[in-house]
Amino acid sequence: MSEKMYPIPFKSLMNWIVTEYAREGEIFGVHTPYYATGKTLPIFGETIETPFGPAAGPNSQLAQNIIAAYFAGARFFEVKTVQKMDGEELARCVPRPCILAADEGYNQEWSTELEVPQAQNEYIKAWCALKVLSKVYGLGSPDGFVFNMSVGYDLEGIKGEKVNSYIDNMMDASNTAQFKECLAVLTELFPEEKDFIAGISPRVSRSVTVSTLHGCPPQEIERIASYLLTEKGLHTFVKCNPTILGYKTARTILDSMGYDYIVFDEHHFNEDLQWADAVPMFERLQALADSRGLEFGLKLSNTFPVDTTRNELPGTEMYMSGRSLFPLTIEMCSRISRQFNGKMRISFAGGAEFFNCDKLFAAGIWPITVATTILKPGGYNRLAQMVEKTEKLPYHAFNGTDSAAISDMSAASHSDFHHLKPIKPLPARKSEDKVPLIDCFTAPCKGGCPIHQDIPEYMELVRRGLYGPALKLITEKNPLPFLTGTICAHRCQNKCSRNFYDESVHIRDTKLVAAEHGYGALMASMKPTAKLPGKKAAIIGGGPTGIAAAYFLARGGVETTIFEREAKLGGVPRYVIPAFRISDEALDKDVALMERLGVEVKCGAPAPSVEALKKLGYTHILMATGAWQAGELGIPGTVKGVIGWMKEMKQQVKPCLEGHVVVVGAGNTAMDAARVAKRMGAASSTIVYRRTKKEMPADEHELKLAIDEGVKLVELAAPVEQKDGKLVCNQMKLGEPDASGRRSPVATGETFEIPCDLVISAIGEKVDAKLMAENGIEMGRKGPAFQTNVENVWSAGDAHRGPATVVEGIADAAAFAEAVIGKAHTYEIPEQAYPAKADAIAKKGILKMASCACCEGGRCLDCNTVCENCVDSCPNRANVVVKLADGRHEIVHVDKMCNECGNCTQFCPYASEPCHDKFTLFQTEKDMNESENRGVLFLGGDKIRVRLEKDEVLDLSQPNELPQDIETLILTIRGKYSYLYTE
């Protein structure tokens, strides 16, 4: 496929809009239109109905982008920058992919990739279309929006024929062929509006934002702005770079907020506009604008240049935006506001989004333009929520900025969840699967769960208050809802698409709500299953894996006995994990679910040997012993293994520790041990780890809980010896990454001491190898469903994997049960578990933090009902939804609209690139020849060229060998969506 996008002819563009709106009530995939309320804000002698719009960038480069943004609520359009370098010359300088917006944003775009006259035509097309659409569809006043030019990068280029003509034609488009064509097409489409159309103003733009390259001298910036004010008579904003803050300020802010991995040096700070030069220049330009009766202000801010060091994007430098840029930009606003006593107008771009937009507007900072937030799932749809939030505030002409409020905003941003980077690197959001060509909607949470729980379905049931059905659905795959609803590692939440909005849906908490509210009804409905003949199972180990296996077997009709050496079932969660993590009462309820099915439980003595069990008639035996042996630290001194020590502590009823306790390790068990030590009276509790907290295997939440309770953390330390109330440690540093991807700790040769009377070794747990050996089981040798080398003996959970999570143990238990029973468990999902497509679509673009677990289904995006992340995140609208007659939504990639920015790749839940891997609609033979994508080209009549496994020309009126789903999709495109390719 080609990275070159090309404009859609205006008649085709309008045909698309009119057809889609009439059929779906949508425009370019934006689901919900914004209808203006009548409130307006004056600016540049014009009015805007909302203070928002797309910043100069990918969301304002094509007519369809601008129209989509307007439909969602944008009314101020900073159209993409033009300069003397354009078209193919510029495109060759932009590597692909060029956008990375999965978290904080990065890009390598500059100005428009179109030729300047093409860009001009796109803006004129959008201007004319919006004049009519606003009136015909009742979206707002035809005079309720403003187009703001962005030009760069030097005065010579701006005064050159190419850019100068662009400026003149944007100021008055009446003599351009494009403006005349637009009026003719619109009159043809809306003849009843011919008089209105004839009166559309050709003054597309009366204002400009000056964009300069890094290192541009202050004298050049002033010359450009002065020229635009005096020679062109344009209201003018000057865009400033974050480098004006100074290297030390920028580095300190970003480091303190977790962005210490972002690399940049001082050269841009030294070469860019300096504060001492900027202030008097802005004063002169303000005075010049005032003398001409024009408005002047500052655009804060430009993106921030940083180094590419982790293969984020191709090349060596990229430009940072989004949530990490906000604290820098708002600090710039604070300094400017104070310097000019609130009288300098500020146009904002630099991490604005739903959670801060109202505060910006209330402080007098507007217009507010956005890019990164609308490059994420929800896309342009996010604008409506921002508009609705600020509509509640008073609208009035600019009368100054509130310096105190802006200063408070700046300070607060340093600790704001929405701008802080998590301590640990973000987990992978994608699955390992490739995206299907069709029928690709999937719930990534479900794929991230080892037992593939029906998460969206039970979330919906809980949202509806159907707790009994929700718990029944949960226990079809998970017989430990209380345990997993409390301490599950919840990898599902790492995959949740809501992470791209605000925060993951609280899936684990919702499961616990279902368990607590649906338990009675479920217990009342359960009864033993009729027994299968000839099968009798013994389970050695009564921890989570053993309990789960017994549940699955008994449900399937297998006579089952579980053997546990301790007095009660529950394993490590009951005897080791502290009560503040999981209560005995919760465990008892999970055990009761299993017992309800008729499982025989034998506790308080070691299990018989495998041979003895076979002689007792057991046909299938499962080794489900937990990892009870602590890893050996191997240093001299007073050292205890974490498992035995925590078991001992759990038996204590009051604080019993004295002195200083050091826990060596960095997993969740280490966090638990450190918290236990603190709660049991230790003078101090310290975690010692040979790497840094970023490399810790522990959940970030568990680390935070430990630190909040007063546990100390010593990083880059390896214990050597404990003696005389001290722990001697080697000072470590991080070297090259090891096989796990974490950087290896390397000793520096220096040592130090910390107070320590007792060392707890929490460096990993092991299974009792002696028990395995006594039964002839060879560790590590596994067959189907984890069968061991001993006939009819299986292993699961810790005994199979080494230290495993509870849910991994459940997955093993399910596989074992299926092998014994001989078939997979089947069940039905209630109809009430499926939301309507319209309800799922209505959630797109809505940001909302968690409030209560019972309401989390309302935040669930129902990705398996409607995903469309690639549709939302494409600024050019190159991924479109095709709705089949049977109600399915299919994604089709429209090749001509794509410039391979790569943004859709970041948000596809599969290990795939929608722009390359989804079924593609081609415009020309040349386009198809330059691409390897699977897709179709309509050749006229019934003839098509289609590429799947082979590339062929077919006649749709004749029998063919196309897969039925593909043929249906092609016929639907031709029948209902021909506007995608006809010109």
Each model region followed by its residue ranges:
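N-terminal capping/small domains of soluble enzymes
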Residues: M1-E231
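Glycine/Thr-rich beta-alpha phosphate-binding loop at enzyme active sites
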Residues: A22-T37, P242, G246-G342, P377-Y395
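Catalytic cores of alpha/beta
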Residues: A63-A68, A225, A352-V370
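Glycine-rich phosphate-binding active-site loops on the catalytic face of alpha/beta enzymes
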Residues: R75-G87, C240-P242, K359-K389, R691
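Ferredoxin-type iron-sulfur electron-transfer modules and their immediate structural context
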Residues: E317, R323, L328, I374-L375, ...
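Rossmann-like dinucleotide/flavin-binding elements
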Residues: I540-T561, K602-E611, T625-L633, W645-E700, ...
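Rossmann-like dinucleotide-binding cores of NAD(P)H-dependent redox enzymes
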Residues: E559-I562, E566-V601, A674-E721
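A conserved short coil-to-beta-strand element within the FAD-binding core of flavoproteins
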Residues: K602-L616, G631, L716-K726, M732-G735
